[in-house]
């Protein structure tokens, strides 16, 4: 009995989900409006702050192409960043590497998100948060959404704002600490970054509580 040869690739290749406004509309039906999205950038790097953003989109002026910032090119993120700032209510907060070292990265991230939400000029009735954890101490309702930056346009917008803001901060830090190449890797554990740390030791932006530095 002959067997049909299987195709080399699926007939219907996987397409990542595209964020929409469904969570926001559901909250509105429950009487919770305005709705903010919140996300952070920079949990994983060896250096620099973790940056959080909270965004309340204008439902009549949602920028086209919003998605998880990790799925976008730097050019796409920069363009959407400017569109978000021009059309939405935005607040940004950060926790420094020193703050991360005195607490931990999760607490520092959630605290930055809490401050970003509370910094909004328009008070949100509910905040949609990327991930499994809700920042403690919020003055509004909150809903954690796993992979929320690919499911909610509000969270996607927040992820873009946080990512672009942090990348710009690390590019500026490169001028102060030129030995580490922060403008190229934003503090992530690339080979170039690890080599620079081995050659020059850590600087004040490095997270000394992270594993590579614990033995120093």
Curated annotation (Swiss-Prot):
What is an example of a GO molecular function annotated in this UniProt entry?
Answer: RNA-DNA hybrid ribonuclease activity
From the UniProt record, list the reaction(s) this protein catalyses: Endonucleolytic cleavage to 5'-phosphomonoester
Query: Which cofactors must be present for this protein to function?
Result: Mn(2+); Mg(2+)
* Alphabetized UniProt keyword annotations: Cytoplasm, Endonuclease, Hydrolase, Manganese, Metal-binding, Nuclease
Keyword Hydrolase included in the entry's annotation: yes
- Name the PROSITE patterns on file: RNASE_H_2
What residues does the RNase H type-2 domain cover? 33-216
The UniProt annotation places a divalent metal cation binding at 39-40, 130
* The keyword Membrane is annotated on this UniProt entry: no
A cellular component term from Gene Ontology for this protein is: ribonuclease H2 complex
Q: What is its EC number?
A: 3.1.26.4
Biological role? Endonuclease that specifically degrades the RNA of RNA-DNA hybrids.
Which family does the similarity line name? Belongs to the RNase HII family.
Q: Which PANTHER family match?
A: RIBONUCLEASE H2 SUBUNIT A (PTHR10954), RIBONUCLEASE HII (PTHR10954:SF18)
Q: What is this protein called?
A: Ribonuclease HII
Q: Which organism is it from?
A: Sinorhizobium medicae (strain WSM419) (Ensifer medicae)
Name of the gene: rnhB
């Amino acid at each position: 009995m002959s067997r049909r040869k299987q195709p080399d690739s699926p007939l219907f290749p996987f397409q990542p989900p595209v964020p929409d406004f469904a969570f926001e509309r559901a909250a509105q039906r429950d009487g919770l409006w305005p709705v903010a999205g919140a996300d952070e950038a920079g949990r994983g790097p060896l250096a620099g702050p973790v940056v959080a953003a909270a965004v309340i989109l204008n439902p009549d002026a949602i920028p086209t192409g919003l998605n998880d910032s990790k799925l976008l090119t730097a050019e796409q993120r920069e363009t959407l960043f400017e569109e978000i700032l021009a059309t939405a209510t935005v607040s940004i907060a950060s926790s420094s590497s020193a703050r991360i070292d005195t607490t931990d990265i999760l607490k520092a991230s959630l605290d930055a998100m809490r401050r970003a939400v509370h910094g909004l000029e328009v008070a949100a009735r509910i905040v949609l948060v990327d991930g499994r954890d809700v920042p403690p101490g919020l003055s509004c309702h909150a809903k954690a959404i796993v992979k929320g930056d690919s499911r909610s346009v509000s969270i996607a917008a927040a992820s873009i704002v946080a990512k672009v803001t942090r990348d710009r901060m690390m590019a500026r830090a490169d001028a102060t600490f030129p030995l580490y190449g922060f403008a190229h890797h934003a503090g992530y554990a690339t080979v170039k970054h690890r080599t620079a740390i081995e050659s020059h030791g850590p600087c004040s932006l490095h997270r000394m509580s992270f594993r590579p530095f614990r033995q120093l």
